[in-house]
Amino acid sequence: MPYPSSVSFQWKSPLAIALTSSIQLNVKSTCNTDCMNFLKSNFNHTISFPLQQQTGLQDFKVSLFKEIDLPRITPSVSSVITDVVVELSSSNPMPKLQIGFDESYILEVTTNSISIKAVTVYGARHAFETLLQLIRISSNKFVISQLPIKISDAPRFKWRGLMVDPSRNPLSPLMFKRIIDTLASVKANVLHIHLSDAQTFVFESKKYPLLHQKGMYDESFVLTQSFLRELAQYGANRGVIVYGEIDTPAHTASWNLGYPGVVANCWDYIVSTSMRYGENVLSLNPANPNTFPIIDALMKELSDTFGTDYVHVGGDEVWTSGWSKSKEYSDIQKFMKSKGLNSLTELEGYFNKYAQEQVIHNGKHPVVWEEVFKKGNADKNTIIQVWDDIRLLQQVVNSGYKAIFSAGFYLDKQMPLCNSYDSSTCVNTHSMWVWTNRDMYDNDPVKSLSSSEKENVLGGEGCSWGESTDEQNFFDRVFQRYSAIAERLWSKESVVDKESHEVRANYLRCLDVRRDIMKGTGPLYHSFCQLPKKEKSN
């Protein structure tokens, strides 16, 4: 899981090998210190530690009924394998972590060896994850049966991500590392952190510290720059790119708590209309002298902190009434006149373009939500994230932009395929919460695109908006269903068997709970997953 590009094996063959939790890594190619440390760390994380955790446990089962369970094979063990041989073919096997690096691998298991061939360490890391899923427990032994096995694998999309939103309900630093570990286990490679919104501002700004000091419930949940640098490195050690988002010009009410006046004050209008979640209407005040210097500083700090190639500047859901109904509207009109802006829509575009320019000036690629493209405000260097109107995806790529898609992958919704422009899509979804993973699995918005159009689609992101998730339910709400998104982004377009996916995802969930990285995630359906006993504490 996700299902590989090519798999060959002997169906129900008892021919098997055994291995122990002390199995060793054997790197046969040139690999410098950083390369070797990466491989050793990930081999221990993905193979050695999980096997140690599973010692003495029973094998995973789908059912008590043999007819519908996984193949029950009594393995005939021909040998005990003591090492996993890894060969890397690139002269630079550990390139800079960026979208488009080679993640392919070949994994072969025979009666006398386990071998992995990859171009880079990132491909080898994926192979470790696949190898772990081949290992089963039989008579207190770790075995791989149905030999020989050969798996050739590579991702369908370059960008396979998850957006998390700690600005609605906070998440602790440790949670982010568990999220990265879980993403790596399903071969995802991007973590997008939504660092600010109307409700709170969780990013530490050294230039404008009152943003987080006044704009956060508790400073213990502020994501400091030192932690985010550490997190970006932690992600790199798992092959996961970490990048941040500061949303502008809307969703910025929290900025005003630290720097009064930088957000246009339309609270009277919001209260008078009894608007639900009205704080989301407020937008930045262009007439305030602090507004644009703060944007400058934040884009620079984001660029420097994460060190990756991407900075998300938001741009979604701008309500022009947030300006027209504000107490500062006359000053805003004067600003518009000084800049030659004839409408509030043009003012929105001014903000969009300004934020992108700052990111480009810092040598990074801007990422924006679809509205920035839809209103003609996207720079050609900008990546467009299509989140609502999936019809825009084709328009985006035909206009020469790179795109990622999130429409149909909203993990805060029970009806993930419900399109705002077509109410008929909001009815034929599964009523059971757990089976909404099938709706996400069916979501493949590039199927109708031509080959040339698909070249501009980098991939996609699942989105976990945080209004109703915190540390108590995050993993269950998100990762119980993210496996469907992960397989859609990795596996071939022809891989469409939802029941097969559920069995494989359920087993991977069991493995991940056993190795302490997917704790709190419920099963996809009935199954048996024995967990290691924990020592009781007083």
Swiss-Prot record:
<dbReference type="GO" id="GO:0005764">
    <property type="term" value="C:lysosome"/>
</dbReference>
<dbReference type="InterPro" id="IPR025705">
    <property type="entry name" value="Beta_hexosaminidase_sua/sub"/>
</dbReference>
<protein>
    <recommendedName>
        <fullName>Beta-hexosaminidase subunit alpha</fullName>
        <ecNumber>3.2.1.52</ecNumber>
    </recommendedName>
</protein>
<keyword id="KW-0326">Glycosidase</keyword>
<keyword id="KW-0325">Glycoprotein</keyword>
<comment type="subunit">
    <text>Heterodimer of one alpha subunit and one beta subunit.</text>
</comment>
<feature type="active site" description="Proton donor">
    <location>
        <position position="317"/>
    </location>
</feature>
<dbReference type="GO" id="GO:0004563">
    <property type="term" value="F:beta-N-acetylhexosaminidase activity"/>
</dbReference>
<comment type="function">
    <text>Hydrolyzes the non-reducing end N-acetyl-D-hexosamine and/or sulfated N-acetyl-D-hexosamine of glycoconjugates. May contribute to amoebic pathogenicity and may be involved in the destruction of extracellular matrix components.</text>
</comment>
<dbReference type="GO" id="GO:0030203">
    <property type="term" value="P:glycosaminoglycan metabolic process"/>
</dbReference>
<dbReference type="GO" id="GO:0005576">
    <property type="term" value="C:extracellular region"/>
</dbReference>
<dbReference type="GO" id="GO:0005975">
    <property type="term" value="P:carbohydrate metabolic process"/>
</dbReference>
<dbReference type="InterPro" id="IPR017853">
    <property type="entry name" value="Glycoside_hydrolase_SF"/>
</dbReference>
<dbReference type="Pfam" id="PF00728">
    <property type="entry name" value="Glyco_hydro_20"/>
</dbReference>
<keyword id="KW-0964">Secreted</keyword>
<dbReference type="GO" id="GO:0006491">
    <property type="term" value="P:N-glycan processing"/>
</dbReference>
<dbReference type="InterPro" id="IPR015883">
    <property type="entry name" value="Glyco_hydro_20_cat"/>
</dbReference>
<comment type="similarity">
    <text>Belongs to the glycosyl hydrolase 20 family.</text>
</comment>
<dbReference type="GO" id="GO:0016020">
    <property type="term" value="C:membrane"/>
</dbReference>
<dbReference type="InterPro" id="IPR029019">
    <property type="entry name" value="HEX_eukaryotic_N"/>
</dbReference>
<dbReference type="InterPro" id="IPR029018">
    <property type="entry name" value="Hex-like_dom2"/>
</dbReference>
<dbReference type="Pfam" id="PF14845">
    <property type="entry name" value="Glycohydro_20b2"/>
</dbReference>
<keyword id="KW-0378">Hydrolase</keyword>
<feature type="glycosylation site" description="N-linked (GlcNAc...) asparagine">
    <location>
        <position position="44"/>
    </location>
</feature>
